[in-house]
Curated annotation (Swiss-Prot):
SMART domains, per database record: PYNP_C
Species in which this protein is naturally found: Thermococcus sibiricus (strain DSM 12597 / MM 739)
NCBIfam families: AMP_phos, ARCH_P_rylase, PRK04350.1
The family this protein is said to belong to: Belongs to the thymidine/pyrimidine-nucleoside phosphorylase family. Type 2 subfamily.
GO CC field: cytosol
Protein name, as recorded: AMP phosphorylase
Top-level taxonomy: Archaea, Methanobacteriati, Methanobacteriota, Thermococci, Thermococcales
GO terms assigned for molecular function: 1,4-alpha-oligoglucan phosphorylase activity; AMP binding; pentosyltransferase activity
Keyword annotations: Glycosyltransferase, Transferase
Length: 503
C-alpha cells in the first residue's frame, strides 16, 4: 500500500505507524500489527495505530521515528504487513532454557534495534534472561552484537582507558576527579556517562552543571584527540542502541538480569574502543551488590568477559554503605567536586575513592609503578594539574573554564533536620537519601538535593544538624520533608544498644 508521510507532533517512546480506518480495513491491518515502512533507501518497522485524524492514503510518522530516520512531509512510502520475525522463535528457545547460538543472539539484537520486535517481545526476552540466565559465550556474543549494531568510536591516541561504576551509591561524583587525574598523567580516557534513572544524579547530570554534555561522535573524537579526555552523556550517541530498549523493559519489570547488565556495560566500552577498563563495584547495604562474595563473583565475570572482547579489565570492590562526600544532587555534587579539585583536598570518602580508582588506572596504563598509583594520583590532584585538565575539558565541551564553586546556583528553599537525641551515627540509608533528594526535585531541578552534615561513626548531640534539604520550589521542599519524616535516613544510637533483663 502506497501512502504519503504526514509528520505528527507526537512522542510516545515507540515506533508507531498511524493509518486511517479505511486503509486499515483494505489492508486487513489491526491495531498493534507490525508493518514495514519502505522507501528506496531504507526499511523501518512500526506498530499500527488506527486513527480518525489520519486521511486515507496517509501514514502518520511520530517524532520517535524522526529521531532515528529522516522523512519529509508528503514523501511517498510503501506500507507492507510484516510477518513475525524469526528472532521470536529464538526468544522462545531461551524461555525454554536452551543455549542460544551466536547468529540467534545477533538476530535478536538486530531486530530490537530495527524495531522489528515489539515491547512485549523485548520484555519476554529480558524475562527469559532473568529466569534462565546466559553463559559466558552468550554474554560475549550479546556484548559484541549490541556494540556492532550502533556507532563505534575510533580514537588515535592510545592507550584508551575507561572506568565504570555499577552504581547504587548516592553522591558518586568521583569520576569528575578521576578523569582529569588520569588524563593529566598523559593517558587517554573518553568517559561517557548516563543520566539518572532511579538515582538523584547521574554523572552526566552533574557534569552538565559545569559544561554541555551532549556531543556528537565526531565532536568527542576531536575533543579527546586534542586533550585526552571528555565527560559526556552517552545517551546522545548511538552506542549500543539495543541497550536503551532493553533497559525500558528491565525498569518496567523491576529486574536486572546479570548477563544483560554485563553486556550493557561492556558493549559501550567495546564501542568506545576502550583497551583498559576499570569496573567499580560498590558493596554494602542499600546498593546493587550488598555482599562482598557476590561482588567477587561479579568481578570474575567482568574480567572473563573482557578477555573474550580483547580488553584488559580490572575491578575494584569499594565501600558503598553510605553516600560519597557530603552532597547528593547535580549542582550540590558539582560544587563539591569543583571545590575538591581546586583545593586539592576535600571529603575523605571522595578523595580516597577518586585517588584510589585513578591510581589503579595509572598503574594499568603503565605510567605509575605497581603500588604507587594512588600516591601519584594524589600528587596530581594536590598539584593542581587535575584542575587544569578539568578546565580544559570544560572549555572544549563549551563551558566556562573559570567557573567557581560559588557561581553554581543551589536550591534556595531549604530545611534542616536535626538530631532528636545524642549518640553516634550508625547508619545512613542510601535508598532513603536518594528518595528524599528526588522528592526535592533532583535530578530535573539541578539545584535540588541534600547536604549531609554528618557521616557514619561521628558523634552528635541533641539538636545538632544532620542534613539539609535543598529545593527550587516550596512545593518540592514540602514533598521532600514529608518523605524524610516517613523514612529513617540517618540512624543515631548510643553506646548501649539494648538492655536485656531477667526473663
Amino acid at each position: 500500500m502506497k501512502a504519503k508521510v504526514r509528520i505528527l507532533d507526537i512522542e510516545t517512546g515507540r515506533f508507531l505507524a498511524f493509518i486511517s480506518e479505511e486503509d486499515a480495513k483494505n489492508a486487513k491491518l489491526h491495531p498493534g500489527d507490525l508493518v514495514k515502512i519502505e522507501t528506496a533507501k531504507r526499511t523501518i518497522y512500526g506498530d499500527v495505530v488506527i486513527s480518525k485524524t489520519i486521511n486515507p492514503g496517509e501514514i502518520g510518522v511520530t517524532k520517535d521515528i524522526l529521531r532515528s530516520y529522516t522523512f519529509s512531509e508528503g514523501e511517498v512510502v510503501n506500507l507492507v504487513p510484516s510477518e513475525t520475525p524469526e528472532s521470536v522463535r529464538y526468544i522462545r528457545r531461551k524461555m525454554n532454557g536452551q543455549k542460544l547460538k551466536k547468529v540467534e543472539i545477533e538476530a535478536i539484537v538486530k531486530d530490537i534495534v530495527n524495531r522489528k520486535l515489539r515491547d512485549i517481545e523485548i520484555s519476554s526476552f529480558v524475562t527469559s534472561l532473568e529466569i534462565n540466565g546466559l553463559d559466558m559465550d552468550e554474554i560475549a556474543w550479546l556484548t559484541t552484537a549490541m556494540a556492532e549494531t550502533g556507532d563505534m568510536l575510533d580514537i588515535d591516541r592510545k592507550p584508551i582507558m575507561d572506568v565504570h561504576s555499577i552504581g547504587g551509591v548516592p553522591g558518586n561524583k568521583t569520576n569528575i576527579l578521576v578523569v582529569p587525574i588520569v588524563a593529566a598523567a598523559g593517558l587517554t580516557i573518553p568517559k561517557t556517562s548516563s543520566r539518572a534513572i532511579t538515582s538523584a544524579a547521574g554523572t552526566a547530570d552533574v557534569v552538565e552543571v559545569l559544561a554541555p554534555v551532549t556531543h556528537s561522535l565526531d565532536e568527542i573524537k576531536r575533543i579527546v584527540e586534542k586533550i585526552g579526555a571528555c565527560l559526556v552523556w552517552g545517551g546522545a550517541l548511538n552506542l549500543a542502541p539495543a541497550d536503551d530498549l532493553t533497559i525500558k523493559a528491565e525498569r518496567a519489570l523491576s529486574i536486572d538480569p546479570r548477563g544483560l547488565m554485563l553486556a550493557s556495560i561492556m558493549s559501550k566500552k567495546y564501542a568506545m574502543g576502550s583497551q583498559y577498563v576499570l569496573i567499580d563495584i560498590p558493596t554494602g547495604e542499600g546498593v546493587k551488590v550488598e555482599k562482598v562474595e557476590d561482588a567477587r563473583s561479579l568481578a570474575k565475570d567482568f574480567i572473563e568477559l573482557g578477555k573474550r572482547l580483547g580488553q584488559y579489565v580490572e575491578t575494584a570492590i569499594t565501600y558503598g554503605g553510605q553516600p560519597i562526600g557530603h552532597t547528593v544532587g547535580p549542582a550540590l555534587e558539582a560544587k563539591e567536586a569543583l571545590e575538591t579539585i581546586i583545593e586539592g583536598k576535600g571529603p575523605g570518602s571522595l578523595v580516597e575513592k577518586a585517588t584510589g580508582l585513578a591510581g589503579i588506572l595509572l598503574e594499568m596504563g603503565g605510567v605509575a609503578p605497581a603500588g604507587m598509583g594512588k600516591k601519584m594520583a594524589k600528587e596530581i590532584l594536590e598539584s593542581g594539574k587535575a584542575y587544569e585538565k578539568l578546565k580544559e575539558i570544560i572549555e572544549e565541551q563549551g563551558g566556562d573554564p573559570n567557573i567557581k564553586p560559588e557561581d553554581i546556583p543551589i536550591g534556595d528553599k531549604t530545611y534542616t533536620f536535626v538530631a532528636q537525641t545524642s549518640g553516634y551515627i550508625t547508619r545512613i540509608d542510601n535508598k532513603a537519601i536518594t528518595a528524599i533528594a528526588r522528592a526535592a526535585g533532583a535530578p530535573e531541578d539541578k539545584g535540588a538535593g541534600i547536604m549531609l552534615h554528618v557521616k557514619v561513626g561521628e558523634k552528635v548531640k541533641e539538636r545538632d544538624p544532620l542534613f539539609t534539604v535543598h529545593a527550587e520550589s516550596g512545593t518540592r521542599l514540602d514533598q521532600a520533608i514529608i518523605q524524610a519524616r516517613r523514612m529513617e535516613p540517618i540512624r543515631i544510637e548510643g553506646m548501649v544498644l539494648q538492655r536485656i533483663g531477667n526473663i
